[in-house]
Amino acid sequence: MLTLGLESSCDETACAIVNEDKQILANIIASQDIHASYGGVVPELASRAHLHIFPQVINKALQQANLLIEDMDLIAVTQTPGLIGSLSVGVHFGKGIAIGAKKSLIGVNHVEAHLYAAYMAAQNVQFPALGLVVSGAHTAAFFIENPTSYKLIGKTRDDAIGETFDKVGRFLGLPYPAGPLIEKLALEGSEDSYPFSPAKVPNYDFSFSGLKTAVLYAIKGNNSSPRSPAPEISLEKQRDIAASFQKAACTTIAQKLPTIIKEFSCRSILIGGGVAINEYFRSAIQTACNLPVYFPPAKLCSDNAAMIAGLGGENFQKNSSIPEIRICARYQWESVSPFSLASP
């Protein structure tokens, strides 16, 4: 079975083709550089760009796989969560292809797909497992009993970890997206230069707003506004703040894991999302947990359509009926069920 996946939940326009063995035959991702000057994604610009770019990435994916639309068995498209305009563009492209080529169409949950990206690239994952999604929009922990059953056990109470990296980057005067730049600066900084403390919140939830404010005050002074211009700071100070912040942000998540693993008798860890590409984060997780940890390859950490096609194909094969696609901007935490057909 061949599945063509479409991803447009935010500012990446992506198309991929995946077969029933989880082999990626094509994986095309077009990032939108137009948002950099705004310091973040502008929803209207993102949706307009998707309209322009989708035909190109779809054609490139088909060319890369040396296939035709007629060869596809299924069209999978991101339906939730994300920017409503961007989601709508992707869904309507998917519907158009499905109707025109007389193919089946299935909607996919973007957050579930990030977890599936780790599962997709792994071999012999042992269950039950702990699942972590660490991205620009979401930070959450899941108990995965088996590949078709899991439940939410903790999530951020405020900012997502990836969002926090970008906001701290703005404080430091770095361009968007700031995550890779902070990681690079941190390599030459001292992580103990600033006493940023990882947040401690009850249960298995996370919090990053206090850390974000602490970094703001370290750069601009107490009671500063996030919108006030960043002062001129030395490269050495940039490096030290980046390293100290990165340590605290990663520790905020890593410190929770041993307790979760013990409580739920987890035998492995699956991690997905853009922050999963950060090498310091990977090391912190592996150090905190004496378990097999499965990260996606770098090309599947950020938003991509291969994870959408893979999860869509898996769901289609395991379910006898396909629910109607429902576009939804917000993630519906109470109705998650990875690798299954969960409607928002």
Swiss-Prot record:
Question: So which cofactors does this thing need?
Answer: Fe(2+)
GO molecular function list? iron ion binding; N(6)-L-threonylcarbamoyladenine synthase activity
Enzyme category, top tier: transferase
Please give the CDD domains that the UniProt record associates with this protein.
ASKHA_NBD_TsaD_bac
Q: Which residues bind Fe cation?
A: H110, H114, D303
Where the protein is mainly located, per its record? Answer: cytoplasm
Q: Which UniProt keywords apply?
A: Acyltransferase, Cytoplasm, Iron, Metal-binding, Transferase, tRNA processing
The residues that hold substrate are V133, V134, S135, G136, A137, D166, G179, N278
EC number assigned by the record: 2.3.1.234
Catalytic activity entry: L-threonylcarbamoyladenylate + adenosine(37) in tRNA = N(6)-L-threonylcarbamoyladenosine(37) in tRNA + AMP + H(+)
Q: Which InterPro entries does the record match to this protein? A: ATPase_NBD, Gcp-like_dom, KAE1/TsaD, TsaD
> What are its GO cellular component terms?
cytoplasm
Q: Where in the cell is it found?
A: Cytoplasm
- Domain of life of the organism in this record? Bacteria
Cofactor binding summary note: Binds 1 Fe(2+) ion per subunit.
> One biological-process term from Gene Ontology?
tRNA threonylcarbamoyladenosine modification
Q: Which HAMAP family does UniProt cross-reference here?
A: TsaD
PANTHER family, alphabetized: TRNA N6-ADENOSINE THREONYLCARBAMOYLTRANSFERASE (PTHR11735), TRNA N6-ADENOSINE THREONYLCARBAMOYLTRANSFERASE, MITOCHONDRIAL (PTHR11735:SF6)
Q: What does this protein do?
A: Required for the formation of a threonylcarbamoyl group on adenosine at position 37 (t(6)A37) in tRNAs that read codons beginning with adenine. Is involved in the transfer of the threonylcarbamoyl moiety of threonylcarbamoyl-AMP (TC-AMP) to the N6 group of A37, together with TsaE and TsaB. TsaD likely plays a direct catalytic role in this reaction.
What protein family does this chain belong to? Belongs to the KAE1 / TsaD family.
Q: What is this protein's record name?
A: tRNA N6-adenosine threonylcarbamoyltransferase
For this protein's source organism, the top of the classification is:
Bacteria, Pseudomonadati, Chlamydiota, Chlamydiia, Chlamydiales
